[in-house]
Curated annotation (Swiss-Prot):
InterPro entries: MEMO1_fam. Transmembrane segments: none annotated. This is MEMO1 family protein M1425_2054. It comes from Saccharolobus islandicus (strain M.14.25 / Kamchatka #1). Belongs to the MEMO1 family. It comes from the Archaea. Pfam families: Memo.
Amino acid sequence: MKRLPAVAGSFYESDPKKLKMQIEWSFRHNIGPRDIPKQTYEKKKRDNLFFVVPHAGYIYSGPVAAHSYYYLVSEGRPDVVIILGPNHTGLGSYVSAWPKGEWETPLGSVKIDEEILMQLVKESEVIDLDEKSHLYEHSIEVQLPFLQYFFDDDFKIVPIVIMMQTPEIAEFLADAIYNVMQKNPDKDIVVLASSDMNHYDPHEITVKKDEEAIEKIQQLDYKGLYEVVEGKDVTLCGYGPIMVNLILAKKFGKKAYILKHATSGDTSGPKDSVVGYLAARFGS
């Protein structure tokens, strides 16, 4: 079963050569890390297990996303990348995993880790196996070319989209991921929370709203983050995935490190109506 790209040619370049250049542009951008990371091939225990990465068009959020990937790549190739994204389309189940096969992008195909996926399904009791949720959803797809640029097809993924973004669902998912990671100590597993920040306010308002959410992220306060999003009109689209990583970070004794916060006004556009983007890592 192959999932074909839904947003190649719109969110990112559909030509492989141009796509690689777009990824390099993201790393070298003055909002980005300004350098392309060197991948280590020495296998050692990974420190940064969990990340927040944005998922907009690369011309807008690519330079911010590059900060998270800089740290991920610098610690070497993971065996499995669990990618949690919000469900923008409203299709499918409350929590949906692509069941098997592979995902294709202009840079090639990446296989699903069906063994880890089925362990998560068994542990969580909230994950449905459902392709419909993923067919047109971009939040996971846009992460793959960044990973493929460095690791080719030498890693596997577990793609999960979350429509029901509540603290209770986040707790179920975090517990399941924690248990699976504990049961597979020989597998190098990282978890990406794919999310943009506040949407379509002027730059100054978006920065202020985002800062309220970022404060809760720094505190690993997942319920506080939920309250900010729900109670203060902070239109952060992937708060469910971020809540999962906040819970996981606390379980693993990790701290939050904000790598970069910017808006589309900083990267590629006018500042009267912007989207906020955050790169964060959770490590020692």
